[in-house]
C-alpha cells in the first residue's frame, strides 16, 4: 500500500515573490540621532511590508567616527585615563539618548542598551591600553573607528524591531565581508561574495538585516576598515554578493545634481547616469559617489540609486551600466577647489633649455 505524503497547510498557500531585493545604505546624516533613526526604521518597515527583501547598511551616528579617532590620538599622545573616562560618558549619553528617541518598546530598548554598554566597555579598555602603550597603530585605528558603526547597528535594528518587524544586526565580518589586511584601506577578498550569500541569503524573507558599514575583518578575524566612503562600498559589496535588484544610497540630497546646489541654487537632479559618468564626476570633485564604491555593483550590473532620506518619494538618480542619452549636451559641472594650473612655455634660446624641468624640481620640494 502506497503511503500518502504529508502536506503542510503552509505549502498550499502560494508564496508571493518579493517585489525587489534591495540593499539600502544610510549615511551619518540619515542616522545622525535617535529621531532620524526612528524615521529610517519607519521607512524600512514600509518597504519590508510591501514585500521587498531588505538589507540595511548603517554608518555611525553623526560625528561619532571623528570623535573616536580624536580620542584615540589623545590617548596615544596624552596618556590620560581620565580623558578616556570622560569620552566614555559622552559616548554613552549620546547613544543612550538615541535609544530613548528611536525605540518605544521597553524590552527592545533594554536589550539594545545592554549591547551598547558591553561594546562601550570594550572600547574603554582598548583606549586605556593605548594610553599605557603610548602608540596608535593602523590596526588599532581600525579597531577604534569600527565602534561608530558597531554602536549604531543595534539601535537601527532595535528601532525596526520596536515597530513589529523582525530584524537581526551583524558586523561586516559576521555578514561575511573578509578583506585584505591593509588597515584603513582594506579590499574584499573573492570569498566574501560566497560567504555573504551563505550567511544572509537564507534570512532575507523574514527579517530586515542590519549590517555595519565601513568595516570587515581579515582572514584572522581582525577588524579592518574599507577606507573613504566605506559604508557605500559595504553596500555595493553586499548588493553584488546577494544579486540585489538595486542598491540604494540614502543621503541628504535628491540624488546626483547637475552641479553643487550650495553654489548654484538652480541645480537639478540628474534622473539617470551611467557608471562611467558617475565615476568621472567623482574623480573631478563631485562628492556623492566615490569611484571605488560602485565597482562591485558594476561587476554584477546592479543599478545604484541615490535617494534623499528626508524626501523618500523623490526617485533620485539611477546609476546604470548604459549611458543615458540626455537632450542636454552637458549633464553636470563639477568643481575642484584650491587647484592651481601652471603653464610653462619654453623658448629654446641658447642656454635656456631645461627651464621647465628645473622649475618642476623646485616645486617638488614645496608644500
How would you describe each model-predicted region?
Residues 3-294:
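Nucleotide/pyrophosphate-binding catalytic subdomain
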Residues 219-220, 258-259, 305-307, 315, ...:
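Short helix/loop capping segments that flank catalytic or ligand/cofactor-binding pockets
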Residues 246-248, 303-306, 311:
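Internal nucleotide-binding/catalytic subdomain
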Residues 251, 306-308, 345-348:
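Active-site proximal loops enriched in glycine and acidic residues that flank catalytic Cys/His/Asp
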Residues 289, 300, 312-317:
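Surface-exposed amphipathic alpha-helical tracts and adjacent flexible/coil segments at the periphery
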Residues 297:
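Acidic-aromatic/histidine active-site loop/patch
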Residues 315-367:
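A conserved regulatory-domain signal marking ACT and ACT-like small-molecule sensing domains
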Amino acid at each position: 500500500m502506497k503511503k500518502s505524503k504529508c502536506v503542510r497547510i503552509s505549502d498550499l498557500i502560494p508564496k508571493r515573490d518579493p517585489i525587489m531585493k534591495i540593499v539600502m545604505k544610510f549615511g551619518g546624516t540619515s542616522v545622525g540621532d535617535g529621531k532620524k533613526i526612528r524615521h529610517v526604521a519607519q521607512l524600512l518597515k514600509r518597504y519590508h511590508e510591501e514585500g521587498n527583501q531588505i538589507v540595511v547598511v548603517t554608518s555611525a551616528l553623526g560625528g561619532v567616527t571623528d570623535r573616536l579617532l580624536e580620542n584615540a590620538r589623545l590617548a596615544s599622545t596624552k596618556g590620560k585615563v581620565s580623558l578616556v573616562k570622560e569620552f566614555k560618558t559622552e559616548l554613552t549619553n549620546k547613544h543612550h539618548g538615541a535609544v530613548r528617541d528611536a525605540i518605544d518598546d521597553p524590552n527592545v530598548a533594554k536589550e539594545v542598551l545592554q549591547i551598547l554598554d558591553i561594546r562601550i566597555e570594550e572600547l574603554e579598555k582598548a583606549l586605556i591600553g593605548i594610553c599605557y602603550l603610548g602608540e596608535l597603530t593602523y590596526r588599532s585605528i581600525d579597531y577604534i573607528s569600527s565602534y561608530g558603526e558597531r554602536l549604531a547597528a543595534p539601535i537601527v535594528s532595535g528601532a525596526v524591531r520596536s515597530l513589529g518587524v523582525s530584524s537581526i544586526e551583524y558586523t561586516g565580518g559576521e555578514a561575511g565581508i573578509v578583506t585584505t589586511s591593509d588597515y584603513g584601506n582594506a579590499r574584499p577578498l573573492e570569498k566574501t561574495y560566497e560567504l555573504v550569500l551563505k550567511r544572509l541569503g537564507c534570512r532575507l524573507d523574514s527579517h530586515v538585516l542590519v549590517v555595519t558599514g565601513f568595516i570587515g575583518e581579515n582572514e584572522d578575524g581582525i577588524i579592518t576598515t574599507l577606507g573613504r566612503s566605506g559604508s557605500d562600498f559595504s553596500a555595493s559589496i553586499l548588493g553584488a554578493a546577494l544579486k540585489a535588484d538595486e542598491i540604494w544610497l540614502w543621503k541628504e540630497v535628491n540624488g546626483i545634481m547637475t552641479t553643487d546646489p550650495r553654489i548654484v541654487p538652480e541645480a537639478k537632479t540628474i534622473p539617470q547616469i551611467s557608471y562611467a559618468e558617475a565615476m568621472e564626476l567623482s574623480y573631478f570633485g563631485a562628492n556623492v559617489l566615490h569611484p571605488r564604491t560602485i565597482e562591485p555593483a558594476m561587476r554584477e550590473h546592479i543599478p545604484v540609486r541615490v535617494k534623499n532620506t528626508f524626501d523618500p518619494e523623490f526617485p533620485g538618480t539611477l546609476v546604470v551600466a548604459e549611458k543615458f542619452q540626455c537632450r542636454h549636451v552637458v549633464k553636470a559641472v563639477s568643481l575642484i577647489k584650491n587647484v592651481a594650473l601652471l603653464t610653462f612655455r619654453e623658448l629654446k634660446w641658447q642656454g635656456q633649455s631645461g627651464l621647465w624641468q628645473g622649475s618642476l624640481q623646485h616645486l617638488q620640494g614645496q608644500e
